UniProtKB/Swiss-Prot annotation:
Residues annotated to bind GTP: 59-62
Its job: Displays ATPase and GTPase activities.
Species per Swiss-Prot/TrEMBL record: Carboxydothermus hydrogenoformans (strain ATCC BAA-161 / DSM 6008 / Z-2901)
Protein name: Nucleotide-binding protein CHY_0272
The keyword Repeat is annotated on this UniProt entry: no
Amino acid sequence: MRFLIVTGLSGAGKTQAMRALEDLGYFCVDNLPPVLMPKFAELVAHAENKIEKVALVVDVRGQKFFQDLDWALGELTKLGIKYEILFLEARDEVLLKRFKANRRGHPLGVRGSQILDNIKKERKFLENLRARADKVIDTSDLQPADLRNEILNYYGEEQKRSKISINIVTFGYKYGLPLDADLIMDVRFLPNPFYVKELRPLSGSDKPVYDYVFNYEVTKKFTEKFLDLIEFLMPFYQKEGKSNLVIAIGCTGGRHRSVAIANFLARTLEEKNYEVYLRHRDLEKHREE
């Protein structure tokens, strides 16, 4: 039985994660009190109709919650039930924006308290639990569909895969590093189409920009060597039990060079029969500024 505990910061996307897990065939329970977790796990393990995958969504509700959860996790271990923890988080300003958009109060809020103060308080409460998590997803820059795809990718066919899946994400250094990246490659050393007037409004997904970037010998040599490195590392990551490799490709704004390189890598790795997922995190951000 796969026993997954979904937790994290309020507003980080636990509801969307649960819906994705349900689509994967998980038996999902929302807001089960931690003190009931060991008994629930026993009942599920010995159910007449065998349940293969279980996901419990656990929210913060106060200091006693953490004492109860710590006890419950210890009891699960005593019962021989192997569990995994998925922790969802987001940046403070993103969580604040979500709470205001939904016009909801924070679970830790009391009359007169500020949402941002409660977010910081909850983050502090959850530090130790986050450190114990098997998987941490930062949803700050993810749309609901992106989070769903990440859940489906990581928890879907993991046990059946013979190869690691590869997530390639592009980003702009001016917007910050992706927090979940395993490998980060800085491609700001490549010639920059931004300084070519007719190419500036385009992206690395447009042929003129792509051709400009790959017209240079340094680009061809770099991508050849980087592909060699990725393929060299894959069997070692697989040997240690890794099922998903996140490769982040960054340039200044995340629009030209990183996108062109990532598109090339994704296409080439797919041709080599790797399972590849591609996302351009900051591609549209210039339109919002």
